[in-house]
């Protein structure tokens, strides 16, 4: 009788496993596959303690990894199929778009891109372009993306020989960190999908990294939430005046951004202390079409517009057609 119960339990377990999606069974089996089914091979990068895949054509990425990243050097379409690239064992961004390159990211299912010791979740270098789309028409495909937090990281814990790495926070989606407010971020286009982007320290949720401007940002659809570290999706959370912050969508604190154009979708953006929810200085923001927009500025800053009175230059905000909502 006991043997029958064990056998019945095993049958039930097999049956339940058969009901799980393939991605659940394959968790941890990170793959980069070409359209013809051929698997792309990565190469080791000892400096960053990581395996890197140079993407030169259309690929599908699936599975989970802690120490593998993609670099687009020309033009490619990357389908993220329930991919989880949470890099807590290496340096660099999960996905990097090189200077002058162009990448389209197509979302399928639940996807996570998380940088660890160095870099934004998606690095969009100067002159590069990234376009994010959902495979579905109802924005059920998701992307959660975050930049590296400010802090000191032990090299040996990431495969290095010793010592430590001290970094500032980075943007969720955007450019690298620099020491002056120059436009080092490329173009960021969001067309569909449900996207949550978080930046840390001076990094914007979407836009500029530490002391870097935000580049051109176009949002034409989707459900987009962008936060700078220290903010909260349920409302702005007060932090000390010396906390390092950036805009929700736009530039690093006190830095400009390229034009920000929002023509569709549902957009919520939360700026840090002294930073707008959406904007920069200088920066022109245009909201049009059927976009539903809410911008939460940190203390001393506008919901949509510029920084506090002591930082940055003037900008222009244009709202036409359906009016967005701005909260300070």
Which residues are covered by each model-predicted region?
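A composition-driven surface/loop motif
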Residues: 6-9, 16, 20, 24-327
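N-terminal secretory signal peptides that target proteins for export/translocation
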Residues: 1-2
């Amino acid at each position: 009788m006991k043997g029958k119960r064990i056998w019945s339990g095993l049958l039930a377990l097999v049956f339940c496993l058969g009901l799980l999606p393939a991605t659940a069974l394959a968790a941890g089996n990170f793959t980069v596959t070409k359209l013809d089914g051929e698997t792309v091979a990565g190469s080791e990068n000892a400096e960053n303690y990581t395996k890197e895949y140079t993407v030169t054509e259309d690929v599908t990425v699936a599975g989970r990894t802690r120490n593998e990243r993609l670099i687009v050097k020309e033009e490619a379409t990357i389908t993220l199929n329930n991919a989880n690239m949470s890099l807590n064992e290496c340096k660099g961004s999960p996905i990097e778009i090189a200077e002058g390159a162009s990448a389209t990211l197509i979302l399928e299912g639940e996807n996570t891109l998380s940088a660890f010791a160095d870099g934004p979740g998606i690095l969009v270098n100067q002159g590069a372009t990234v376009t994010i789309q959902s495979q579905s028409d109802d924005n059920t495909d998701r992307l959660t993306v975050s930049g590296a937090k400010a802090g000191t990281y032990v090299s040996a814990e990431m495969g290095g020989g010793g010592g430590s790495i001290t970094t500032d926070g980075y943007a969720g989606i955007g450019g690298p960190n620099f020491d002056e407010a120059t436009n080092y971020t490329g173009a960021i286009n969001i067309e569909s999908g449900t996207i949550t982007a978080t930046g840390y320290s001076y990094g914007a949720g979407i836009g500029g990294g530490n002391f870097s401007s935000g580049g051109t940002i176009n949002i034409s659809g989707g459900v987009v939430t962008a936060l700078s570290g220290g903010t909260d999706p349920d409302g702005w959370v007060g932090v000390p005046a010396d906390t390092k912050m950036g805009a929700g969508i736009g530039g690093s604190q006190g830095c400009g951004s390229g034009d920000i154009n929002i023509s569709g979708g549902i957009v919520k953006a939360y700026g840090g202390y002294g930073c707008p929810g959406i904007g920069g200085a200088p920066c022109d923001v245009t909201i049009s079409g059927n976009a539903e927009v809410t911008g939460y500025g940190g203390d001393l800053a506008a919901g949509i517009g510029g920084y506090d009175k002591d930082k940055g230059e003037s900008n222009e905000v244009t709202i036409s057609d359906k009016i967005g909502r701005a909260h300070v």
